[in-house]
Amino acid sequence: MSEKLDKEDVLYKKRHSIAHVMAEAVIELFPNTKIAIGPPIKDGFYYDFDFEKHIIEDDLLLIEQKMREILKTGSSFVKEVITKEQALMLFKDEPYKIDLIHELDIADEISIYKSHNFTDLCKGPHIDNMGKIDPKAFKLISIAGAYWRGDEKNKMLTRIYGTLWNNEKDLKAYLKLREEIKRRDHRKLGRELDLFSVHEEIGPGLIFFHPSGARIRALIEDFWREEHFKNGYDILFTPHVGKSWLWETSGHLDFYKESMFEKMEMDKSNYYVKPMNCPFHIAIYNTGRHSYRDLPFRWAELGTVYRYEKVGALHGTMRVRGFTQDDAHIICTYDQVKFEVQEVLRFALYMWNKFGFTALKAYLSTKPEKSVGDEDDWIMSVKVLKEALINLGIDYDIDEGGGAFYGPKIDLKIIDSLGREWQMSTIQFDFNLPARFKMTYTAEDGKERQPFMIHRALLGSIERFFGILVEHYGGAFPVWLAPLQVVIIPVNNIVEEYALEVLSRFKKEGIRIKLDNDCNMRMNAKIRQYQSQKVPYMFIVGEKEVVEGKISIRTRTNEQINGLELKEALEFVKLKVSNKEIL
């Protein structure tokens, strides 16, 4: 569920208004520029321009200066309603505005906003006048390319992003947070820590996990599987492709085709790589007959799916074209629904906690205007979702009418160490696919009934969750997730025999450890190197440690733990791993 912006919020109006101020400043500085659209967004605003000349980051300072000059006038924002004919005449030299106007119906209200020397096609809302904007509380922050209307077939425009806050203090706090976000960017850390790569020449949006990143991914997936078995799930494996009839039956080719890869023709049949796992799980269900005594089925899969995303929308491991969903489908009876939903919710909270996420937000989306399924089933399922949230003490917001046409859902968002929300788990009823695929079971009264089906993801996708973890921890993973947990650094060659003994002892206990006996680098340089690589522990081995049979530990945060017995050091690390300690 995307976050909705409150159009009546004063800050929203300010950001909308300053986008107009920026557009006016740009036109004054670059007179032949054509304007497109400029909305407020979370934390700021942007405007898309068609420049005659290429602009650079240095130009942003000139634009900011001109914006402050315009703000000093204190001009009002005045709304006027005009006809479509008047709008076409007013914006006759603005091709992007004309494009928008042509889409409007003759009966539609067309509004413009005038401010200082600028007029824009706009629905609003805006603040009354520019005097309400603190000229020290905004900053233009970046330039990017953006296709007109988001369509790669259209011209690439120049998008200028800015941020605006109520005062200078809030602006500085945001800019500081922004710098920390840049420092933790999973794409940057992915290169620095050698975790993953993307190869445009092979295919955009396709992730290559390197040994260290693959180790972390394997640890996530192993834990996922272990916990699913503990919670009564069976693990499935299904193909990556399926014939077109499957996607016709599921409705994907009717409603989801734009997000699917093109068909492949083989053996006189059309195949598609799967955008979702659900139809495959249903195919397994439909291979046999089922009684109410067999239910519930809890079927989970780390299933790789493929979805066509526009190149401009791709973002590291967060937005990709091929990704692995931690997918599950619960197939159950009416009487089992309440328990199953509550258990899924409890399971989600448990999993997040183990990865270090304790803060969350929940959203319950209810029946939309157009829907499928029995009215009583909708009422019951919404009630069950509400009760599950209440029983587990989870505060939630209701998105009335925001559910999918095939069923209500709970969306759960985690809040990371930088205060950002990330969509993670979804618990979604489906009244559509069971009917489309004619799923049935024999009820207690001997009649054939349609089972309830609940779609469920806990981590969302492994690739995206991986990127979130990288940024949440800034690459300094908890010991249990660290690809390399310990490095032994001997102070000289004399102690190497003892260092090898430590290495062997820890390896036998499953600790991910290595010995750095490179004589060409000083010890302090090695410590700095491994701290920059976010290795949790460095074991410093000198002659004193050899004589006493002990270990001195330096942590990646530069803490020192001296004089631990070898057995104590081993237990110290093992405890951090077995308890999945976060700090």
Curated annotation (Swiss-Prot):
Could you confirm whether the keyword Protein biosynthesis appears in this record? yes
Predominantly, its location class is cytoplasm
Tell me which residues bind Zn(2+): C278, H329, H455
Q: Which Gene3D superfamilies match?
A: 3.30.54.20, Anticodon-binding domain (3.40.50.800), Bira Bifunctional Protein, Domain 2 (3.30.930.10), Threonyl-trna Synthetase, Chain A, domain 2 (3.30.980.10)
Supply the Pfam families for this chain. HGTP_anticodon, tRNA-synt_2b, tRNA_SAD
**Cofactor remark from the record:** Binds 1 zinc ion per subunit.
Q: What class of enzyme is it?
A: ligase
Q: What does this protein do?
A: Catalyzes the attachment of threonine to tRNA(Thr) in a two-step reaction: L-threonine is first activated by ATP to form Thr-AMP and then transferred to the acceptor end of tRNA(Thr). Also edits incorrectly charged L-seryl-tRNA(Thr).
Question: What name appears for this protein in its UniProt entry?
Answer: Threonine--tRNA ligase
Q: Species name for this entry?
A: Borrelia turicatae (strain 91E135)
